[in-house]
Design a protein with these regions (language model features):
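Catalytic donor/gating beta->alpha subdomain of glycosyltransferases that bind UDP-sugars
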Residues: 3-28, 62-138
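Acidic-residue sensor for enzyme active/binding pockets
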Residues: 27, 34, 44
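Loop-to-transmembrane-helix entry motif
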Residues: 33, 37, 137-138, 143-147
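Short loop segments at secondary-structure junctions
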Residues: 35, 52-54, 79
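Conserved nucleotide-sugar donor-binding
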Residues: 44-58
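Membrane-embedded multi-pass helical conduit in multi-pass membrane proteins
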Residues: 141-176
Length: 176
């Protein structure tokens, strides 16, 4: 298909924890859905191919740790679709140590957040068609949701602190 500029495979991870398995299944399902609607901005870098003519190398941030997402988004912005092929799979090994596993996840999340922030000029680009809403949705999921969760946590702590202070009778309190 000449409209496709980049294709990614679905990972089958060996050694993943139970909670990650559910996340990976959901992640792949979303990528496949985005591919059917238009394109996905995220692919697994371990197994992806793209047309070199569809990639603007000058637009890539070489120090970014989300290079696969950069490539996928760059190809789509330059007019070709990006899909995750449901029939293509590859084997990926999860880090054995929990600390290394967590470090990998945090680096990936930070890289995707930075990448999405750099792409904000495309959130409402009509030329991108259905891809612009996909980009906005991913930005909301990866940038706004964590901020809202932190805000909710702080509000909860503040509320309980106020309730706790309201219960103290300061008129009869003495320092000893």
């Amino acid at each position: 298909d000449k409209s496709i500029g980049c294709v990614g495979a679905t990972p089958k991870r060996i050694g993943q924890r139970i909670e990650e398995e559910g996340h990976r299944t959901l992640f792949s399902m979303v990528r496949h859905l985005e591919s059917k609607i238009d394109s996905t901005p995220f692919l697994e870098g371990s197994c992806m191919v793209w047309r070199t003519s569809s990639l603007d190398l000058e637009a890539l941030h070489v120090t970014s740790n989300a290079d696969d997402a950069q490539i996928a988004t760059n190809v789509r912005i330059h007019g070709l679709r990006v899909i995750q092929d449901s029939d293509a799979h590859f084997i990926d090994h999860a880090p054995l140590e929990r600390k290394e596993h967590s470090r990998q996840k945090v680096r990936r999340a930070q890289g995707l957040q930075r990448h999405l922030l750099r792409q904000r000029e495309h959130y409402y680009n009509r030329r991108l068609g259905r891809f612009a809403p996909i980009l906005r949705q991913e930005a909301a999921l990866h940038i706004l949701t964590p901020l809202l969760l932190v805000g909710a946590f702080i509000a909860t702590l503040a509320r309980w602190a106020l309730i706790g202070f309201a219960e103290i009778d300061f008129t009869n309190a003495t320092l000893t």
